């Protein structure tokens, strides 16, 4: 009998070798056995349609199961699904949950949404707080980190211009 860790490793190996249907089956076994990473990957397979037809409802189900086990990436993926549906407030709420679990990319997205007034009232101070969270996060992609730095520089420059003209 193979261990749960073996199932996950075999699933990733199958995925890496282009055996999507085999990977899907293994991720499903791992997810049903309670492996959070397998839940997230299975959700992604259903979300994008890898090894199966895309099924956003099944993706949402698996992402929510992973989130209930504390997975920040799952909360972020749920937010993206809600964004795709045009459900802006729900997307904002789920990015907030993901950011609360330490996801710096979600903090950056919350800053951008706050500046644009999408999903919540426009707020530069709130955007600045989210940018600070993103910049202090250990869980942020390099691209998002660079974008957060650039956005913070832009906000700082805008504040300086406003204080000189005011």
Q: Where do the PLM segments sit?
A:
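Alpha-helical segment of the N-proximal tetratricopeptide repeat
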Residues: 3-33, 44-48
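Hydrophobic face of amphipathic alpha-helices that form TPR/SEL1-like repeat modules
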Residues: 8-13, 41-48, 75-84, 109-116, ...
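Terminal, low-structured helical/coil segments at or just beyond the last alpha-helical repeat
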Residues: 130-166
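Short coil/turn and helix-start
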Residues: 16-17, 32, 50-54, 68, ...
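Short helix-capping/linker turns of helical repeat alpha-solenoids
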Residues: 2, 33-35, 48-50, 69-71, ...
């Amino acid at each position: 009998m193979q261990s749960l860790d073996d199932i996950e490793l075999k699933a990733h190996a199958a995925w890496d070798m282009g055996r999507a249907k085999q990977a899907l089956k293994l991720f499903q076994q791992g997810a049903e056995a309670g492996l959070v990473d397998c839940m997230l990957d299975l959700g992604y397979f259903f979300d994008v349609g890898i090894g199966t037809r895309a099924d956003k409802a099944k993706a949402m189900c698996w992402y929510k199961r992973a989130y209930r086990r504390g997975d920040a990436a799952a909360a972020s993926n749920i937010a993206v699904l809600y964004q795709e549906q045009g459900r802006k407030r729900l997307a904002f709420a789920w990015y907030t949950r993901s950011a609360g679990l330490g996801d710096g990319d979600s903090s950056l997205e919350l800053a951008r949404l706050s500046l644009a007034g999408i999903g919540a009232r426009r707020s530069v101070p709130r955007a600045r707080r989210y940018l600070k969270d993103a910049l202090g996060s250990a869980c942020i992609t390099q691209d998002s980190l660079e974008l957060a730095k650039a956005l913070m520089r832009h906000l700082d420059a805008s504040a300086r211009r406003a204080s000189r003209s005011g």
